[in-house]
Regions:
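Core catalytic region of metal-dependent phosphoesterases/phosphodiesterases
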Residues: 2-7, 14, 18-119, 174-178
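Active-site environment of divalent metal-dependent phosphoester hydrolases
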Residues: 15-19, 56-59, 86-97, 132-135, ...
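Beta-strand-turn-beta hairpins that frame and shape the catalytic cleft
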Residues: 2-9, 119-127, 142-146, 194-195, ...
Length: 343
């Protein structure tokens, strides 16, 4: 069998434009790509595979975000001999068809190939765009050593809490002939059998709290692979105040977003002092204090500066969304939309 590659670097689900086209997030995306290129060059890797969801918003591309995209694509084009880019569901204007995507100009870069129109098979590999209609049935016929795609497989986790239900359609067993299957779409790193979800580039929100196993994947033709985590990635943490005061260094690091649950009584002045001190000492991106119970507020105006919320709002909302039973509404889609509301 001919070899499509000797070794390659893989990344997925970067989501340019997330958090209302946040400049901070887009800078994170660009800096991640610069870091990835450095790591690939250290190993003399010339091929790069992207497994879907370059942009976050399907209907519109913000002008600022577009400029970040152009810079990032130029970096990929200039630093790799070949870049295969799969279109994920977030890259498509319509979820159920692929005739319009948000990267129509990417093929203008000579070293970048967009995988959107159909399954691309060559020399022992298959690149599969977001599947529509009954295209999933074709995957049983693939005889490639490696399959790369953006698959929504049942019994894998969307995040630490939510497992993808079985809606019929594609299953992991449909790709059992492949030695390895690498997929974007689910942001949590996980594997089962020959299926590997390497995880997205870096944590995006509090559903990723304490889960930093994301970044890039190095794959060799012999099937061996290893992961590398971006050291400057943003992190998300949720912890009790008592834990924070006891061992802040194990919880807080540079670029951390954190929610601190007030499991001990403190005054409003003490709360402000804690926030200001830890934010400065650890170069935090965000710190918010959350009463563990509503009655812990004790009449004090905890919401004066907008940084403190009632207990477990996220878990309450997520549990309600997860409990919805409907033939026409996907719980995981609602959960994803809710998670993306956090800025």
């Amino acid at each position: 069998m001919s070899k499509f590659f000797d070794d390659a670097v893989i990344f997925t689900d970067i989501h340019f434009g997330l958090k209302n086209n946040s400049k901070q997030h887009n800078n994170d995306c660009l800096n991640f790509i610069k870091w990835m290129i450095v790591q690939a060059h250290k190993r003399n890797i010339k091929k790069c595979f992207f497994l879907g969801d370059w942009h976050h918003h399907r209907a519109t591309i913000n002008v600022s975000t577009l400029n970040y995209t152009v810079d990032a694509l130029q970096l990929l084009n200039d630093n790799f001999d070949e870049v295969q880019m799969i279109m994920g569901n977030h890259d498509l204007y319509y979820r159920e068809k692929r005739d319009i995507n948000s990267l129509p100009f990417a093929n203008k870069y000579p070293n970048i190939n967009i995988i959107n129109d159909e399954i691309f098979e060559e020399d022992g590999v298959a690149f599969v765009p977001w599947l529509v209609d009954d295209e999933w049935k074709r995957l049983k016929e693939l005889k490639s050593k490696f399959i790369f795609g953006h698959f929504e497989l049942p019994d894998f986790y969307l995040n630490a809490m939510i497992k993808m239900p079985d809606h019929g359609g594609l299953k992991a067993s449909d790709m059992s002939k492949a030695e390895k299957v690498f997929s974007g779409h689910f942001h949590k790193r996980q594997d089962k059998g020959n299926i590997i979800y390497p995880g997205n580039c870096f944590p995006h929100n509090y559903s990723d709290a304490w889960d930093d196993d994301r970044g890039i994947t190095f794959l060799n033709w012999d099937g061996t692979y290893d992961f590398e985590t971006w050291p400057d990635a943003p992190k998300y943490r949720v912890a009790n105040l008592s834990q924070l005061l006891d061992d802040a260094g194990s919880i807080l690091t540079n670029n951390t977003h954190c929610r601190i649950i007030l499991d001990i009584n403190i005054s409003y002045e003490e709360a402000n002092y804690i926030k200001e001190t830890f934010a400065t000492d650890y170069n935090l991106r965000e710190i918010s204090l959350m009463p563990s119970k509503k009655d812990n507020v004790s009449g004090e105006d905890w919401d004066t500066d907008g940084d403190v919320s009632v207990e477990n709002v996220d878990s309450i909302v997520l549990s309600q969304l997860e409990a919805i039973t409907s033939n026409s509404i996907r719980n995981e889609t609602l959960i994803s939309i809710y998670n993306d509301l956090h800025i």
